Amino acid sequence: YYQLVHVRTRMAKKLGYENYIELGYYRMMRFDYNKNDVENYRKQVLEDVVPLDNELYARQQKRLGYDTLHAWDEKFEFTSGNPAPKYSREELVKRALKMYQELDPKTGEFFEFMTERELLDLDSKPGKAAGGYCTFIPNYQSPFIFANFNQTSHDAEVLTHEAGHAFQVYSSKDIFPIDCVWPTYESCEIHSMSMEFFIYPWMKSFFEEDVNKYYFNHLSGAVKFLPYGVLVDHFQHEVYEKPEMSCEERLATWRKLEKQYLPH
């Protein structure tokens, strides 16, 4: 990481920038807002979201009956267990198809396209790369979803979040030039995160009696992510504004910001 910061700083200076921040914004396709706008957003999260998150974590600690809520406890929401889909991968895909057909004719057409052409690689397999994502295959004008189902709520979120990305790029597949098929990076998340919420009325068919646990887990998880997201962003601004910082100074900077955004 130390070497990466210095390489990026040299790149930026060679191109005439004061530091890597402005170049980084361009590389991330942040064209409509600047670091001042992002700083203002961080302040709003600090003022409005961090107190709410502190309350959510306090309620979680009480709900679990712990004296202290440790970092490794944070993903454990209910003493009865976190919500998980009740069905196999094959059945979940069938239910997702029905869901998208009922949501709108266009989303139904899209998901039929995905399933008929086997454009979802969802099973966990030995040697398979970790993670999940949606990409686009230009020669076939097709989205492709890659994931590793593991019988947790993330399986359902693949069929909503990544499908949100896939529906957007499916709808944009005829746009030319090809660079405009995807929007900017942050704008991409509008489609994926929105889809997660659009399909709430159908989640009972995935989680059955645990659906309310899923709603709580999903919504509170989205709120809890905001301070962490801006923490990472703030840290990167500090690092690239002061590339001469030592590793120890960067660690101290991270810890200082962590206490600010994640005080629980």
Residues covered by each model-derived region:
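Cation-handling catalytic/transport regions enriched in His/Asp/Glu
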Residues: Y1-H264
